[in-house]
Curated annotation (Swiss-Prot):
Single annotated GO MF: alanine racemase activity
A Pfam family reported for this protein in Swiss-Prot or TrEMBL: Ala_racemase_N
Catalytic EC class: isomerase
Record organism: Oenococcus oeni (strain ATCC BAA-331 / PSU-1)
Binding-site positions, substrate: R135, M313
Keyword Transferase found: no
Subunit structure: Homodimer.
Function in brief: Catalyzes the interconversion of D-lysine and L-lysine. Can also use arginine and ornithine, but not alanine.
Residues annotated as signal peptide: none
Protein name: Lysine racemase
Cofactor: pyridoxal 5'-phosphate
Length: 371
């Protein structure tokens, strides 16, 4: 998708807020090392925009989901540590070794196949251990031990550098399942050789359980919390300790006075009850501003203004208190005057969780670092 750089709609990303959240996360978790998840376009904030400023914000490494995300970062000239979290097809193992990625491996069979095609460049291996997420990774101690022994026996092709598990409910007030996974983790790794990177703390574990993870709490592998979203949405931790890292803004492209009884947008789901000033904005569900956000209060000139009518692919309308000139700034998420629209506000309005709101932002949205 083409980035719409000649359009007023944009994401304004705050470097200072990101740096603050990094330091806050390290402080709360006690982690000495923080790897920032920049998968899925950095949770919608912009893969390269965030990756380019991560190191100066205190981030010690990057984590992506797929090989192509890592390659894009490397091709942008960024030489930071990169972890590939998701499984990759074994035929691409030489590419992962070429770019010096810490590569997640989920089975001995994968290692055996990779051993046949790897060249002089060693593959840095990150072993996945399934303690209850039931997504990827080995489940038995024997399988884990066999993987480690294979890596040691084939050190000409592999470097055993990482091991991890992923907690499914570390941000849940009911920590029963977290405790079950934690206990399973320690049972599985007991007595086995550990690499230099032992990482189990996702955002929830880092914020609420770090002291319960002795020997495994020096690395925080996080995303949500650094992007300014409290993982439990205020249940287990204070929302106001984190800073929002972006604002979403646009500007009026058309303004007209509509008489009473007129339908607005597709299906005429909103009908004016009186003469109403209507403004048009160049943003829609094609940008990730979803249909679920219909009727959300936008901010214009320090006032709350209701979005009206069905949200179209590229445009939507807003009811104005009076006529505004074309080009007037509109804040969808962020501050205007005494009011602020947060991700939590949009979540309460729509039912869409904060991290899903941002991940939905499409590549068409212009992204810019503002401080």
């Amino acid at each position: 998708m083409v980035e719409a750089i000649h359009r007023s709609t944009r994401i304004e990303f705050s470097k200072s807020s990101l740096a603050y959240n990094v330091q806050y996360t390290k402080q709360v978790s006690g982690a000495k090392t923080l790897w920032l998840a920049v998968k899925s376009n950095a949770y919608g904030h912009g893969l390269l925009q965030v990756s380019k400023i991560a190191r100066e914000c205190g981030v010690d490494g990057l984590a992506v989901s797929v090989l192509d995300e890592g390659i894009a970062i490397r091709q942008a000239g960024i030489d930071d540590f990169i972890l590939i979290l998701g499984p990759i097809d074994v035929k691409y193992a030489p590419i992962a070794s070429k770019y010096h990625f810490l590569t997640t491996v989920s089975s001995l069979d994968w290692l055996k196949s990779a051993d046949k095609i790897l060249g002089k460049e060693k593959l840095s291996v990150n072993l996945a251990v399934d303690t209850g997420m039931n997504r990827i990774g080995v489940r038995s101690k024997k399988d884990l031990k066999d993987e480690i022994e294979f890596l040691q026996e084939h050190s000409d092709h592999f470097s055993y550098d990482g091991i991890f598990t992923h907690f499914a409910s570390s941000d849940n007030p009911d920590d029963h399942y977290f405790q079950r996974q934690k206990n399973r983790w320690y049972e599985l790794i007991d007595g086995l050789i550990m690499p230099r990177y032992v990482h189990v703390m996702n955002s929830g574990a880092a914020m609420y359980h770090s002291k319960e993870l002795p020997g495994c709490n020096s690395i925080a592998r996080v995303g949500t919390v650094v992007y300014g979203v409290e993982p439990s949405e205020g249940v287990l931790g204070p929302i106001d300790k984190l800073k929002p890292v972006f604002e979403l803004k646009s500007a009026l492209t058309f303004v007209k006075k509509i008489p009473a009884g007129e339908g607005i947008s597709y299906g005429s789901k909103f009908v004016t009850s009186r003469d109403t000033w209507i403004g048009t904005l160049p943003i829609g569900y094609g940008d990730g501003w979803l249909a679920e956000y219909q009727d959300f209060q936008l901010l214009i000139d320090g006032q709350k203004c209701r979005q009206v009518g069905q949200i179209a692919m590229d445009q939507m309308m807003v009811a104005l208190p009076h006529e505004y000139p074309i080009g007037t700034e509109v804040t969808l998420i962020g501050k205007s005057g005494k009011y602020e629209n947060t991700l939590y506000d949009l979540h309460k309005h729509s039912g869409v969780p904060p991290w899903k709101i941002t991940v939905a932002f499409s590549d068409r949205l212009k992204r810019m670092v503002v401080d």
